[in-house]
Amino acid sequence: MRLSDTDIEEWLSKKKLVIQPYPKKQLINGITVDIHLGNKFRFFYDHTTSCIDLSGSKEKIALDLNKIVSCETIFSKKEPFFLKPGALALFSTLENITLPNNLVGWLDGRSSLARLGLMVHVTSHRIDPGWHGNIVLEFFNAGKLTLVLTPGIKIAALSFELLSKPVLRPYNSRNESKYKRQNGVVPSRIYEE
């Protein structure tokens, strides 16, 4: 069962679901909460390695990833980021999300931005029960024009689905969870698998 706007407001007021900063009422509509672009990002360098062999050693994968992904960069509040056509970049949400063990979150891009060619997540739109932290967005510009992105703009929407029972192994309690308590823009940790 997906939570309605009334349910979301109730879960937030009872602190069963935590979103910081606390969303204004006008951001909670239908079955979603609008979320915003944070000011932290990482971009991908062009032509620093020819490929990443995902079947290679963990050490080689980590080395290759470090060659292609920038360090985390922090923008000032109104400083723009230019996402060129065909470019991939990682951003964090402004909001920090905490989900209880009986709720799964779903991230969806905004239709108005998709119509300009902006994909805000490349396939990873599930937020596991027990999650705590920022959400990293994988931006891809599939359009023909450079998109100018500024921290604080509405960038995506979250919806929430109630599970039949709380999960036994929530995300932040599992030792192998690569992104638990994520703060900022954490790049791929596929080499930890």
Curated annotation (Swiss-Prot):
Top EC class for this record: hydrolase
Known pathway: Pyrimidine metabolism; dUMP biosynthesis; dUMP from dCTP (dUTP route): step 1/2
GO BP terms: dUMP biosynthetic process; dUTP biosynthetic process; nucleobase-containing small molecule interconversion
Pfam families reported for this sequence: DCD (PF22769)
Active-site positions on this chain: E138 (proton donor/acceptor)
Lineage top rank: taxon: Bacteria
Amino-acid positions noted as binding dCTP in the UniProt annotation, renumbered to this chain: R110, S111, S112, L113, A114, R115, D128, V136, L137, E138, Y171, K178, Q182
Keywords from the named record: Hydrolase, Nucleotide metabolism, Nucleotide-binding
Reactions it catalyzes: dCTP + H2O + H(+) = dUTP + NH4(+)
Residue ranges of the TM segments: none
InterPro entries tied to this protein: dCTP_deaminase, dUTPase-like_sf, dUTPase_trimeric
Molecular function GO terms recorded: dCTP deaminase activity; nucleotide binding
EC number of this enzyme: 3.5.4.13
Keyword Transport on entry: no
Keyword Hydrolase: yes
Subunit structure as annotated in this protein's UniProt entry: Homotrimer.
Function according to Swiss-Prot or TrEMBL: Catalyzes the deamination of dCTP to dUTP.
Family of this protein: Belongs to the dCTP deaminase family.
Protein name: dCTP deaminase
